[in-house]
Amino acid sequence: DFSGNVTRAMRAIDGTIVLVCASEGIMPQTETVMKQALRERVKPILFINKVDRMIKELKLTPSAMQERFLKIIDHFNILIEQIAEPEFRGKWKVNVADGSVIFGSARDNWALSVGFMKKKNIGFKEIISLYDGTMSDDERKKWIWEKAPLYEVLLDSVVKHLPSPVEAQKYRIPKIWQGDKESQFGKDLIECNKNGEVAFVITNTIIDPRSGKEINAGRLFSGTIKEGMEVYLNNEKKKQRIQQVLVYNGIKPESVGEVPAGNVLAITGVV
């Protein structure tokens, strides 16, 4: 049960990729996570994962696979219709044609969307042929890396369909923050103003195994965080000085001088 982690993470993000198993469909835990996301006004896109199982284990025909995909997509959109607020229902439903639905195998590191298939001139026939025994593992990996790499398809879809912080904070702040929206601070939050007062929400704290220091990760909604700057801790009712400002390159934290509003980052020196 990751619901506590999910709740904290929802404050730090504006969009999410929802993974659904192609064989099992949308499970109750996935529905719970979708409810949390939609109630926080976090926009979802759909990744139908483990398509390789449908080919290798279930040995489904292309038409049977298509039927399974459509059932998952319909279920996903029904949940959006039931849970999302009226202003987002129509805009946030996913469909295959615009690339907000992705198919793939995270384990085998490939993915496809309609737009990507057109760009690369490939289809599911080529994917099915990957598992017919005519290719070695090295040949399959080479084909995937050249033709349908997971990272490229996912990132293309994220850039195209998920909102920027500047766009998202306009409709998310009124939902997740109960302060005065007409105050200067409220306007800074809504506008994602990098020159405004610092508003950093810590969503996770870990201990660096090398240094033993606490690393506090979270979302910067307003202002610019800089190394050495003094910040006010709202819960502790005291001021402390930031030692390091970090951004993550994959899972590796890298020190930077400063980070503006709208980013996910980490800091040290604040306990």
Regions found by a protein language model. Give the residues of each.
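Structural and coupling elements of P-loop NTPases
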Residues: D1-V271
